């Protein structure tokens, strides 16, 4: 039997569109063991809409890895514990992909390194900013160079908490990407480039005073504001209430705030109240940054 724990992730971190992501201490668990017949058991906080057959993304990812290494696809049973909210901008699909790949690799004898697994994960997901932190942990910077991904951990465990405010509605990545323009201005490109560099500096040196400006973005948040009622106001409310920085998590609708532990409650309440004023209910998760990434447990 193999059990793997996979963290939630917040990608597009601040200005780091499609390149910066953060692993969070909210986990899915994948368990695989030999069986007489194929079956999938679902458990956890979020099971609705998760396929219990061969179309399941965890299983498809497993088969992808086994085929890549020439390992005969075995007859197994899977138990999938889903605690990461799906289609909310917290990396549920990346957790499924990475969990499936890591579990399959371990089941086959651990023949691939994490860097090799990352390449397969990126091919399945299509972009590396969620799969990299899900696999490696911490805050990661990932870029695609020709046909491969280069990923490095910027900071494994920053000294702040991550407050994830999760509105009670689904928002698919496809729908969220469709509102983005095909081209951007030079000014906006420079704006995000400079703030991405500033954010990396702030993270490496634990300079929390730089996070407010370092988390600013012009490439996707304003463009997606129409999909998340009250987004702009709630991002500002987080800062006004004492957060170091705030951003849309992934493609949304979750909103992320980086906070100190002693200000987390007031920031959380202010953000939930802000969304409520726009007719949305939301659940707050106070999380730490996961430093390990996907792990066999």
UniProtKB/Swiss-Prot annotation:
Top EC class, one word: transferase
Gene Ontology biological process terms in this record: threonine biosynthetic process
A GO term, aspect molecular function: homoserine kinase activity
Location within or outside the cell: Cytoplasm
Keyword vocabulary terms for this entry: Amino-acid biosynthesis, ATP-binding, Cytoplasm, Kinase, Nucleotide-binding, Threonine biosynthesis, Transferase
Pathway: Amino-acid biosynthesis; L-threonine biosynthesis; L-threonine from L-aspartate: step 4/5
One GO cellular component term noted in the UniProt record for this chain: cytoplasm
Residues reported in the UniProt entry to bind ATP: 85-95
Source taxon at top rank: Bacteria
Main localization, broad class: cytoplasm
EC number: 2.7.1.39
Function description: Catalyzes the ATP-dependent phosphorylation of L-homoserine to L-homoserine phosphate.
Family designation: Belongs to the GHMP kinase family. Homoserine kinase subfamily.
PANTHER family: HOMOSERINE KINASE, HOMOSERINE/4-DIPHOSPHOCYTIDYL-2-C-METHYL-D-ERYTHRITOL KINASE
Descriptive protein name: Homoserine kinase
Organism: Desulfitobacterium hafniense (strain Y51)
Lineage, highest ranks first: Bacteria, Bacillati, Bacillota, Clostridia, Eubacteriales
Gene: thrB
């Amino acid at each position: 039997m193999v059990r793997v724990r996979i963290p939630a992730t917040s990608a597009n971190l601040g200005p780091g569109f499609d390149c910066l992501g953060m692993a969070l201490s909210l986990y899915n668990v994948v368990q695989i063991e030999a069986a007489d017949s194929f079956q999938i058991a679902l458990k956890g906080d979020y099971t609705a809409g998760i396929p219990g057959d061969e179309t399941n993304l965890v299983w498809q990812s497993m088969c992808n890895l086994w085929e890549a290494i020439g390992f005969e696809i075995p007859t197994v049973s899977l138990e999938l514990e889903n605690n990461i909210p799906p289609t909310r901008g917290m990396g549920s699909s990346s957790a499924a992909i990475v969990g499936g790949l890591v579990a399959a690799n371990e089941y086959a004898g651990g023949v691939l390194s994490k860097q090799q697994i990352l390449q397969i994960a990126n091919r399945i997901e299509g972009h590396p900013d969620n799969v990299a932190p899900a696999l490696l942990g911490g805050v990661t910077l990932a870029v695609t160079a020709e046909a491969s991904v280069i990923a490095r951990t910027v900071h494994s465990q920053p000294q702040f908490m991550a407050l994830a405010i999760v509105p009670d509605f689904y928002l698919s990545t496809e729908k969220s990407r469709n509102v983005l323009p095909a081209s951007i201005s030079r000014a906006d490109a420079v704006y995000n480039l400079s703030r991405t560099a500033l954010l990396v500096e702030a993270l490496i040196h634990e300079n929390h005073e730089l996070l407010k400006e370092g988390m600013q973005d012009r490439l996707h948040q304003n463009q997606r504001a129409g999909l998340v009622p009250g987004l702009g106001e709630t991002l500002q409310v987080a800062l006004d209430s004492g957060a170091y920085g705030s951003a849309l998590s992934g493609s949304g609708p979750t909103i992320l705030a980086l906070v100190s532990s002693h200000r987390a409650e007031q920031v959380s309440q202010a953000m939930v109240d802000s969304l409520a004023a726009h007719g949305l209910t939301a659940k707050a998760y106070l999380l730490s940054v996961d430093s390990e990434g996907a792990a066999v447990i």
